[in-house]
Amino acid sequence: MYVALRPFFRRKYLLTNAEKDFYQVLRSIVGSHTIWAKVRLADLVGADKRHLLRKSNFDYIKSKHIDFVICDAALSPIIAVELDDSSHQRPDRVARDRDVNRILEIASLPILRVPVRRTYDGAEIAKQLLATLQPVV
């Protein structure tokens, strides 16, 4: 007997446990700013239409996402935050992270990379956020 399987299902949670824990820390320190999770890189930066490689540049960024983006009251992105677990040590992830860092640098959007931990010190994360934003502000 053939049983049709559904090709898709709704995930129970948007964030992993590590991401949820870190999100709560961010919530406690960003004040009136808005935090967005799992934002597509192509929604943060655009590929210049005049550039010869526009299509391939867009194709590259459309499948990448940033763990968290903090926006101001106008919903303008002010900083990207990546939560780096052990997978970021793999050669393919190291290359991907280097590319993402460079893309965000070109687009003038600062990025803070935070290693995954069991617990986070909100004051330390706040200090890191401010230090990362300092050259921009």
Predicted regions and their residues:
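Membrane-proximal, solvent-exposed terminal domains/tails of membrane-associated proteins
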Residues: P135-V137
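N-terminal, charge-rich interaction modules
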Residues: L15-E19, Y23
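Nuclease-adjacent, charged terminal/linker segments that flank catalytic cores
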Residues: M1-R10, L14
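Active-site metal-binding core of divalent-cation-utilizing nuclease and nuclease-like domains
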Residues: L14, A37-I78
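Short secondary-structure junctions
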Residues: I29-I35
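Basic, amphipathic alpha-helical patches used to engage nucleic acids or provide basic targeting signals
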Residues: K64-K127
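Short low-complexity, flexible loop/linker segments enriched in glycine and/or proline
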Residues: R50-L52, A126-A131
